Amino acid sequence: MEITKQQIIHTDVLIIGGGTAGCYAALTIREKSDAKIVIAEKANIKRSGCLAAGVNAINAYIVKGRKPQDYVDYARKDADEIVRGDLLLTMSEHLNEVTSKMEQLGLVILKDENGDYVARGNRNIKINGENIKPILADAVNQLDNVEVINHLNITDYIVEDNTIKGAFGFHMENGTAYEIRAKKVLCATGGAAGLYKPNNPGFSRHKMWYPPFNTGAGYAMGIDAGAEMTTFEMRFIALRCKDTIAPTGTIAQGVGAKQVNAKGEIYEDKYGITTSQRVYGTTQENLEGRGPCYLRTEGIEKEKDTDLKKAYLNMAPSQTLKWIEQGKDPSEQNVEIEGTEPYIVGGHTASGYWVNTNRETTIHGLYAAGDVAGGCPQKYVTGALVEGELAALDIVEKLKDQTFDITDNKEEQLLDEKVKEYNNILSDKDSIFTIEQMEEAMQKVMDAYAGGISSHYQFNENCLNLAKEKINNLITLSGQLSAKDYHELMFYYELKERLTICLTLIEHLKARKETRWHSFAENLDHPQKSDDWKKYVNTKKVEGKIKVILRELVKEDEHYEHQNQQK
């Protein structure tokens, strides 16, 4: 099998990733301009990205009596200061606006007898959100002058003189190679799962917290193109219901369940209640012989059993099925909990592209929004929508004010070269290893040497140096891999993306000489927090090597622009 068909497309805006941020950006651009848009989606926008299975709450909302600065303060505290104040505030100021827009599009938001949204805690409101992604996708599909290309896997940016010109990719169903030339590009490809050995083995390995199909393509393309990245060392580890990997927040907030050890002792007060502290406390209780750990649901009101079962059917039905299979309701037994493997995801932590206040990266004309954008944790659904909107608004303004020449007399030659690369991997050559075996080897290395589950999320510099050496060896070996069809070709590039991210992540973990976030970055060489590290750890690939850049914190009242940026 080989790629024989080629297509070159010229457009105003290319959106890579038709998930939460990507779809909302398209809606905003078309509302504010007549720009031509192409959305390149690896799956199908109807059920792609983090919202594919739906959600039962909007977790980032300014409820009555609160203001945007309150949300900024919450996110800053959870991340222990390492956030971009400008990004958090501009996001928080628009959370309610995008929520209202989603309701207008058809999202069902629960209301009380007074017609007010039903709050769940200080920052959340309840929704019936099983169909939230189809609602977004349907709105996009109705837009004029927007071409959605489903099953198109983007593999590389086209960058000249540090300015984005478009991207290359291939279609996984018909095998067409694409070169899409664009005046502006928005990367909205989500975060990175599958770097570490997961909770569940074999067939169930994709029973995980984050979509296994989000493999960090946007990060990897940016790294290889020389974009600056930030805070990868703030990994995200979710505290989940054991085995089902279902959310714990639904129980903790819905019925006020506390974290308890096997002795029935509440331990969350001992370690703290930030996201990383909850994971760390659970890990420590198990290590010190007081596990397993649970969310205490025994004794809750019977009507709450039905509420919890219904809530999980909207988002994680396996948890409801587990209760039914065991023949015990939540009120009759506590729910066992565990931490997941680490992920890189800018919607929960501050990891991702280093962007200016308008969400433009250090590559001119390339924007990032949602999980792929760094500096702004605790985005959740609405934060991703806002970032898509903010990036879109700046894109619209720049399209008005600037002139562009995206054509290149070498377009066909460049696409020919990319097709040769694809077909070299699609060749019939025998490989000693399969792509899946190489992926498992990568996950084993990261698990053992870079702070995975088996090492209790802990690492030291010697281990990280070994991880770097072994990942580099795997990168060399991956050059011998082959793919028998277009689907396997996608798997090859997903592996390539993850290996690229692993190297950058290792450098970030090495660079921060402190332990600011337990479990997220548990550095045994530097087990204490230090004010000397109240700064951003950024990286940039320069001439094939990853360079560490330390930057000072940015506050809410600053409008950050990239300085001394080579063009």
Across the structure, where does each feature detected by a protein language model lie?
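Core beta-strand elements of the Rossmann-like FAD/NAD(P) dinucleotide-binding domain
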Residues: 8-11, 174-184, 362
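N-terminal Rossmann-like FAD-binding beta1-loop-alpha1 element of flavoenzymes
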Residues: 13-39
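Glycine-rich FAD pyrophosphate-binding loop
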Residues: 31-53
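Glycine-rich active-site loop/strand segments that organize a redox cofactor
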Residues: 59-91
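Mobile, glycine/GP-rich and aromatic-enriched active-site lid/loop segments adjacent to catalytic centers
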Residues: 104-155, 231-380, 385, 448-567
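Helical element adjacent to the flavin cofactor pocket in flavoenzyme catalytic cores
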Residues: 129-156, 160-179, 219, 225
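Glycine-rich loop(s) and the adjacent beta-strand/alpha-helix scaffold that form part
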Residues: 187-246, 381-394
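Long, amphipathic alpha-helical stalk/connector segments used for oligomerization, subunit docking
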Residues: 400-484
